[in-house]
A protein has these predicted regions:
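Short sequence/structural segments immediately N-terminal
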Residues: 4-5, 19-75, 88, 284, ...
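A detector of repeated loop/turn-to-beta-strand junctions in beta-rich toroidal repeat architectures
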Residues: 42, 88, 130, 172-174, ...
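Surface loop/turn motifs at the tips and blade-to-blade linkers of beta-strand repeat domains
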Residues: 62-65, 104-108, 146-150, 188-191, ...
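Periplasmic c-type cytochrome electron-transfer domains
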Residues: 66, 71, 209, 214, ...
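Residue-level detector of Asp-centered blade-edge/turn motifs that repeat once per structural unit
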Residues: 76-77, 118-120, 160-161, 202-203, ...
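Short loop/turn segments that connect beta-strands within beta-propeller blades
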Residues: 95-99, 137-141, 179-183, 231-235, ...
């Protein structure tokens, strides 16, 4: 009897376990199908519950601390190469004879560029996420001074006499000019939108500053990106040259004679329905040229070919003899070599009308492209040796520097910077994000529309059932892992759905990512994309008087007349901390005649100041316009009773909102404080 009871208990226990397992298996299959939007994804628990860990022991075990070389500079004698290791917050020093790293200097957060004085004894490094420069003594390898800059310092250049230092402030769209004798900022000039690079002309008479984002433009018009020209003598902006139908002008260079100034650029076709991708009607890539003669003609030429695109051109350098230009294409892991004499001949024989035609001509590059040189993953900054014989290439996602012989146009060496040898899942995802290999003929990658994993400020006319409807304003990808759903219409409940089959159908026009690649891409998006610190509007967390008043407006429950505001129409209902989104759908009265009836997912507000334009279709150029132009009926929060000063204060508060981590630990206390203030 006891034996039978034991058998019964054993089999009963097994039956219960089996039933539990069967039910759990059914649930897990349903869960995976829901997350991925496919029926056969071999997703396992590790994909979502290990690879996407941001903090803790698991995150430390599965991730690595990579270097990610970004920009380069050479000592005047060419014996030492200085490498900005962006992810390591370090400046690496490489012996160019032995091709070994010989020193490492800790610098500030998110370093961008380095420049070396002609005596080879002093360097300056821009720390983009710290709003300062480090002055470094290259003998002692010590930081000897810190200079406060504008917001987001990027490229730094010396005036030809080295008396002044020009700093491109990328986030505040300015150029800071420092007197190097007094170490003080003496001027700050307005540049284009999101400037990143600058270069002096060979005669030292002027500097040009490139920009990445379009200027504010009338709604529904093509992008217009500024190249700012600064007069060196007066240190004033003397001209603002506008490149139409172009953006992401990352870097620029002058020929030694000064006859040409050349910038990298991308020509987006964002206003055309994306139904002719094979003809380049999505993105084309090339260069912008300004002639010193011919009344300063401005020309755009492509580096693409009819059946192959060379996406995301980043840096450009020109040989000392002025015969060749080298361009790094970070989206396809290629260096393009251009014959500048062929460029000159083409310009000399062509009218402006003909050159305008060439700006969209995919075949014209055959005339001036000499060679394509493959590199490691994600080539970024370039620098030529003083004699022009060697080109150094920062392979950002390889943690290496490629060395190319500029005479044979072959890679002759690879400098290992001693980064981790293991490629993590998230690192592979970052490579995929920055590579165009999954789109039709390599025409664009995730980075193209999401530079710095953010957004490009453009509105796209994506292919759909009805052409020209449901225009989409590009959304940021920063810190979005915890705030589904995705897309403005909230159709995708997970990043797997967002970047899976639906993504390939609408955007890439090729096979969808395989399962391992999709796992990797999701891991990177969830764990590897952070918000920059909001040093411009909220550097310490202590709000200004105007921001405090705006905070009260944001959390108010009654109008100025004392009338209670319905809960569903209070700002904080749809935009509660820490992400300032409730992740729910809402109608805010902003549908246009070209939109299908739909609700919209409440967007996050972290670092909202750097995400213009606003609304689902980008129709609001500024935060103010959300209420001054697009809220007549108080459907997007009650605002029509507000005084102008109150609106100004509200906007100031919105600009102060920073990363969600500052609000996560005290959401309830945060709400309680607001209720008490009200």
């Amino acid at each position: 009897m006891k034996r039978n009871k034991k058998i019964f208990l054993v089999f009963g226990g097994l039956a219960i376990i089996s039933l539990f397992f069967i039910q759990f298996h059914k649930w897990s299959v349903h869960h995976v199908n829901y997350i991925t939007a496919v029926d056969d994804h071999p997703l396992n628990c590790m994909s979502c519950h290990l690879y996407i860990q941001k903090d803790g022991i698991a995150a430390k075990l599965i991730n690595e601390d990579y270097l990610s070389p970004y920009n380069l500079s050479l000592a005047p004698d060419g014996k030492k190469l200085y490498v900005i290791a962006q992810d390591a917050n370090a400046l690496l020093i490489v012996d160019t004879k032995t091709n070994k790293v010989i020193d490492k200097i800790e610098v500030g957060e998110k370093p961008h560029s380095v420049v070396i004085k002609n005596d080879g004894e002093t360097a300056f490094v821009s720390n983009q996420w710290a709003d300062n420069l480090y002055e470094i003594d290259l003998t002692s390898l010590k930081v000897i001074d810190t200079l406060k800059t504008g917001s987001g310092p990027a490229e730094i250049i010396f005036s030809p006499d080295e008396k002044f230092l020009y700093v491109v402030d990328s986030y505040s769209s300015e150029v800071s000019i420092f007197n190097l004798q007094t170490k003080t900022e003496i001027k700050r000039l307005m540049a284009g939108n999101n400037p990143v690079a600058a270069v002096f002309s060979p005669d030292g008479s002027q500097a040009i500053v490139t920009s990445r984002r379009t200027l504010p433009i009338p709604y529904g018009t093509p992008p217009m990106t500024e190249l700012t020209v600064i007069d060196a003598a007066s240190q004033r902006v003397k001209e603002r040259k506008i490149f139409e139908n172009a953006y992401l002008m990352e870097n620029a260079a002058f020929t030694p004679s000064g006859d040409l100034a050349i910038s990298t650029l991308i020509r987006p076709k964002n206003l055309i329905p994306s139904v002719q991708v094979e003809r380049g009607w999505m993105m084309t890539h090339g260069i912008g040229i300004i002639e010193s003669g011919n009344e300063g003609r401005m020309i755009q030429l492509l580096t693409d070919e009819p059946n192959s695109y060379y996406s995301d051109p980043f840096d450009i350098v020109i040989s000392p003899d002025g015969q060749k230009a080298f361009i790094s294409h970070s989206g396809v892991d290629i260096i393009t070599v251009i014959d500048l004499n062929e460029i000159r001949a083409l310009l000399a024989e062509s009218t402006q009308e003909k050159l305008d035609y060439y700006s969209n001509h995919l075949g014209i590059s055959a005339r001036y492209v000499i060679k394509r040189i493959p590199t490691g993953a994600n080539p970024k900054g370039l620098v030529l040796s003083p004699d022009g014989k060697y080109l150094y290439v920062a392979e950002r996602l390889e943690d290496k520097i490629a060395v190319i012989n500029t005479e044979t146009l072959e890679t002759i060496n690879s400098i290992d910077l001693n980064g981790p040898s293991r490629i993590t899942v998230a690192r592979q995802g970052r490579r995929l994000f920055n590579n165009s290999g999954h789109t039709f003929q390599n025409q664009y990658g995730c980075y193209t529309c999401h530079p710095d994993s953010h957004e490009d400020g453009l509105v796209y006319n994506m292919a759909g059932a009805d052409m020209g409807r449901n225009l989409a304003n590009t959304q940021t990808l920063r810190d979005i892992g915890d705030i589904p759903p995705y897309k403005w219409n909230g159709k995708n409940s997970s990043i797997y759905k967002q970047d899976g089959m639906r993504f390939s159908t609408i955007l890439t026009r090729t096979e969808s990512f395989n399962y391992d690649d999709l796992d990797a891409l999701v891991a990177y998006i969830v764990t590897g994309i952070k918000n920059p610190p909001n040093l411009r509007y909220n550097p310490t967390g202590e709000l200004t008087a105007a921001q405090k008043r705006g905070k009260k407006v944001f959390y108010r429950t009654h109008t100025n007349c004392g009338k209670e505001i319905p809960v569903e129409n209070q700002c904080a209902t749809c935009h509660p901390p820490p992400y300032f989104t409730n992740m729910q759908m809402a109608d805010v009265g902003t549908l246009s005649d070209t939109d299908d009836p739909m609700l919209f997912d409440a967007p996050q507000l972290n670092n909202i100041y750097e995400s213009a334009p606003y609304l689902h279709d980008g129709s609001a150029a500024t935060l103010e316009e959300l209420w001054t132009k697009f809220n007549d009926d108080d459907e997007h929060g009650v605002a029509n009773d507000m005084l102008k000063d109150q609106l100004n204060d509200l906007v100031e508060y919105l600009k102060s909102i920073r990363d969600a981590k500052y609000y996560k630990d005290d959401v309830e206390e945060y709400k309680a404080d607001i209720n008490q203030e009200n």
